Amino acid sequence: MKVIFLADVKGKGKKGEIKEVPTGYAQNFLIKKNLAKEATSQSIGELKGKQKAEEKAQAEILAEAQAVKAVLDEDKTRVQFQEKVGPDGRTFGSITAKKISEELQKQFGVKVDKRHIVLDHPIRAIGLFEVPVKLHKELTAEIKLAITEA
C-alpha cells in the first residue's frame, strides 16, 4: 500500500515522502497513529501543493536575507557605539548581540534577530570590529561595528 508520511518514522520514511509499505503495517500502525495517510491522487495533489508553497516561502526568505546582506555589505553601513572607557582601555558596558541588533534597527532600519548574530563573547574594547551574522542557512554576512570612547 502506498502511503504519505505525515511525520518522520525511523527506518521507514521522512515527513512528506510517498512510499510503498505492507498493507497491514500501514492500516494497523501508521494510519492509526496518524504517522501516515493513504496516498490517493487527491492527497498526492495536496502534498505537491504544500511542497510548492513551502519552496515559494523559502525563496522569499532567501530573497529577504539577500537584501539584508546587500545593505550590510555596503561600506557606509557601520554600526556606531559610544561607550564609557575605564583607565585600562576596556569599556564599562559590553556590546552584546542584543545591543547590536537594536542599534542596527535604530541606525539603518535593518531587522536582524539577535540569535543570528554570531558573537562568542560580548565585546568590551574600543575599535573596529566585524561580527558575522547568519542570515539564512546558506547565507552569511558581516556587521561592521565602530566602538568609540564617549
UniProtKB/Swiss-Prot annotation:
Molecular function terms from GO: rRNA binding; structural constituent of ribosome
Protein name, per record: Large ribosomal subunit protein bL9
SUPFAM superfamilies according to UniProt: L9 N-domain-like, Ribosomal protein L9 C-domain
Organism: Streptococcus pyogenes serotype M5 (strain Manfredo)
Keyword Ribonucleoprotein: yes
Record function comment: Binds to the 23S rRNA.
Matches recorded under Gene3D superfamilies: Ribosomal protein L9, C-terminal domain (3.10.430.100), Ribosomal protein L9, N-terminal domain (3.40.5.10)
Sections of the chain in a coiled coil: none
GO biological process, one term: translation
Pfam families documented for this protein: Ribosomal_L9_C, Ribosomal_L9_N
GO cellular component term of the entry, any: ribosome
Domain of life: Bacteria
PANTHER family (UniProt xref): 50S RIBOSOMAL PROTEIN L9 (PTHR21368)
Keyword Acyltransferase recorded: no
UniProt similarity note: Belongs to the bacterial ribosomal protein bL9 family.
Key words, A-Z: Ribonucleoprotein, Ribosomal protein, RNA-binding, rRNA-binding
NCBIfam families associated with the record: L9 (TIGR00158)
